[in-house]
């Protein structure tokens, strides 16, 4: 089974809040999410084209593990934490399945 991914895109419109958001994500949110989701890898990105755009990606072993996480309580708790700490940050979520991987 191919790997599956959970992607969260956040728009941090206030430039003055981006450093605090970045620290919170690095020190609290990603470690909590990795532990709660039981994922094998996680990444975070800031867009080079749009400085307000932050993206986090979590890799699951397969679609079944991603689907189980989406139905579980861990996601609800992490969403509640995000809403509490960053109520003005809009975000969207997407689920993906690996179609191809190329490595040289």
Ranges and model annotations:
Residues 1-104:
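Macromolecular interaction modules
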């Amino acid at each position: 089974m191919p790997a599956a991914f959970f992607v969260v895109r956040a728009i941090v419109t206030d430039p003055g809040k981006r450093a605090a958001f970045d620290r919170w994500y690095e020190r609290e949110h990603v470690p909590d999410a990795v532990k709660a989701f039981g994922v094998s890898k996680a990444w975070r990105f800031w867009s080079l084209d749009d400085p307000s755009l932050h993206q986090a990606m979590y890799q699951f072993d397969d679609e079944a593990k991603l689907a189980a996480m989406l139905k579980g309580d861990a996601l609800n708790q992490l969403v509640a934490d995000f809403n509490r700490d960053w109520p003005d940050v809009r975000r969207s979520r997407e689920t993906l399945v690996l179609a191809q991987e190329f490595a040289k």
